[in-house]
């Protein structure tokens, strides 16, 4: 079963003057070039890669592909073999795949898109698939590589040449599968063009990145591109989500040969979650599927994580793994770093560090913790909003915090080039009676830990796995987890 071809870019290249040799890698960043590598010089949104051709040659590039827009002229003094390619910005991924010999075609590549849940699902898929006999790699927010040995990254979905270079390296290292986060920016900027997705998951569509996309309609349209991908066999859609339910119906009409599976609590779901129970120790749920019915108990927290588990069940079973085996291995998986990450100390408040940085994600994290909160205890929420991002999201985050938490501490979260107090001022109209307003995030975290009762729960939201605070263009070391652990230790 195959999906329609997404209109990406012209795929037919002229005869390439360069063929990959063992050890030669392609890069679009001249700083990554080593002796013998190939430089791909694309026009970018802010910079023109062709300006860095001399630097790439100095670093050892022995071949250059460059963006041929009809205006650029190759300088003969550069004196290395080269080839101009039209519309290279949109075709770089496909070019790199071809130069690498399309080795990623030998991988089971699974893409995950949606506003929230991408990191958890990709990391769980990798853990589960490894236990089922695959050798699985991850490309995503927390890092790239094999589970347990991820290399840090700066983008959820890397640049197109980097994506293909990663897949090539992983295949050379024996990988058989790859679980990949596919961001809306990645889809819109052609970063995944040339990736042979076999299966794709849609998690949800809630407000985020409107500073980039402008409208929710445009945001959703970009996300949906992944499900019209050439060669896609399985579309796995959260039908509890309004946009997801609409997308699933549309795909069934548009792509009759594509296997479309809806998942969620909805009666319309093909992979339906029933008999859901939750506690501070985790959750249990029954999954009714086209492959049978089974129960899974896990230490993961939250109804939204039950949905994420259902997505994993659907993808793994669609790829041929028996349901009983899938549920058995999913019961063993660990949370992704910074996703409902618990710090437990006897006689002290439970601290949960989570990446929730959208109103929907914050609402779900808080509702999950309210469900397991001890009688008479308070749920605290420490959060802020990122600078130089969608301002309209800020009061919505404040409203989600007030609605879901008993005590709210408003602070900073990567203010970037903005004044952090200005960001807080955008949040405060929705927070009528904050427990504290504190620009210094470390002070805010310590305050919550010091003031909370022993049976209270503290959610520190927004940064999750991040180990930095971005202030005025400088990333200073900062870890919510480290600050909270130290504060708990000092509490006595």
Model-predicted segments: where are they?
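N-terminal leader/targeting and accessory segments in enzymes
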Residues: 1-94, 98, 242, 269-274, ...
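Short, active-site-adjacent cap segments at secondary-structure transitions
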Residues: 71-73, 144-146, 186-188, 242-246, ...
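Phosphate-binding loop of NTP-binding sites
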Residues: 9, 90-239, 245-258, 310
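ATP-dependent carboxylate-amine ligase
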Residues: 1-22, 32-38, 48-51, 257-259, ...
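Acidic, Mg2+-coordinating active-site environments of NTP-dependent enzymes
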Residues: 72-76, 173, 188, 197-351, ...
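Short secondary-structure boundary segments
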Residues: 67-69, 182, 204, 239, ...
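Short, conserved loop/helix-junction motifs that constitute active-site signature segments
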Residues: 57-59, 75-77, 193-196, 226-231, ...
